[in-house]
Amino acid sequence: TGQMLFMRAYQYGEMIVYHGGMPYITKVQDKDKDDLFVTRNSTAECFDLLIKDLDDAISLLPAKAKGNDYGRIDQCFAKAYKAKMLLYKASPQFNPSNRYDNKYWNEAYEAAKEAYDFCISQGIKLTDKYSDNWLVDGNSEVVFPIIYSNPDKTAGWENTIRPASLSRSNANNTPTWDMVKAFPMLDGKSFDDPTGKYYVGNEDVFLQRYWMNRDPRFEDCILYNAALYPVSGTSTGYRQYTSVGIAVREDSYGINPNVGSTATQNDVISGMYVRKGSDVSLSQDLVSTFDHDYPFMRLAEVMFIYAEAANEVGHRDVAVDMLKQIRKRAGIEAGEDGLYGLKVGGREEIRQAILDERNVELCFEGHRFMDLRRTRNMMQLNGLQKYGIEAIAINEDGSEMTITEAQRKANSYLLTPENFKYVLRMVPISAIAENKFLIQESYYFFPIQESKILENPNLEQNNNWGGTFNPTME
């Protein structure tokens, strides 16, 4: 019963964050007696019913699923999900006119504190190594896993991120230049922060050395041109090249006219690949057997929820402590002030630090889009474009290396990242200059499908999509 109550709350929770209030059905409907043309509950009513379902589930669930029950819902996950939903309830997405001083933040804080403290009491803790989250099943940080086991159930992750030459498919999930810039330097500060130990100046200078002195998570998450990539079955010292004419066509990115070769995936990839979660012990022929568990929720996310709510209700010491723990585990230098490069001078600065750290720590885990919606920051993307990085081999004097010489050196893995110059290219390369983000206010809540409204005329459409239903808490 506890499992089913949680699943009902979870299913409704996922609908609420996309659409606002939905018809929240709490009893089995009888097609002969009940009116099946139900109306939408208000968003406030849905949150109340969802939290009641979670509280009832928590009272019935074991503290922590162990042994043969590992992978089943337990109190740790239910409490953490409750905190996550109350964070949404308090968020700007649902409270556009009173974003950070509404009464719901205290409720979110209490739930987040309870979830964090309970997880810690059950032995959940940050892993020593960041990469263990993806490559060590049953690690200490997992709050709830999605379990995979070859051959019964495998994950397609490896096929979506690897270069085509080492996979059985073409990568369709690649980083952008903005994601590269988001990672701090080794001292925790931005590359363009003049107070930083590793300050490099402006973006043009940084582009030519973007892989140097970075947050260690950068190496764990981003596979860049000429980086070592010891995939099983490759030669000793193998480097993954992306430069046109040097890398195989399916792996290359760019439009260098001096090469005499063209890249075939310019409209799909970005000159970089995702390294996060890549199991290099799998050779190309075994890539489809990838079966590491996926950490659907891990302690770091719970800590971010706790930090965000704590900051908004005045417990800024708690928020900063959560961020420091995460950066310490990442391997960032503490600095003389022990702040790991964080800018945490006040409520607004801490708020931004939390969102920035979420972007890095949780990258490629499916959170960023929802974070931008939840905080009503999506429209900050308007007018921006996506960029990838083309690598072009150069000589010591900076002149462009002949393709014959570049190929000869690359065949022996003698070309390192320093032996290239880097140029930003629009993603996709075929895009026109006007291909920029244009986010509408209406995107913070999605519409109900027209087909569903035709099936049930009592379903109101959202007021930002031509209807009358208010999906917010206001």
Feature-to-residue mapping (PLM):
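Secondary-structure transition into beta-strands, especially the periplasmic turns and strand N-termini
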Residues: 1, 5, 106-114, 310-320, ...
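Beta-sheet entry/capping signal
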Residues: 3, 23, 141-143, 217, ...
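Short, well-ordered loop/turn and helix-capping segments at boundaries between secondary-structure elements
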Residues: 21, 117-121, 149, 224-227, ...
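An aromatic- and glycine-enriched ligand-binding surface/loop that stacks and positions planar moieties
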Residues: 55, 72-79, 84-255, 380-407
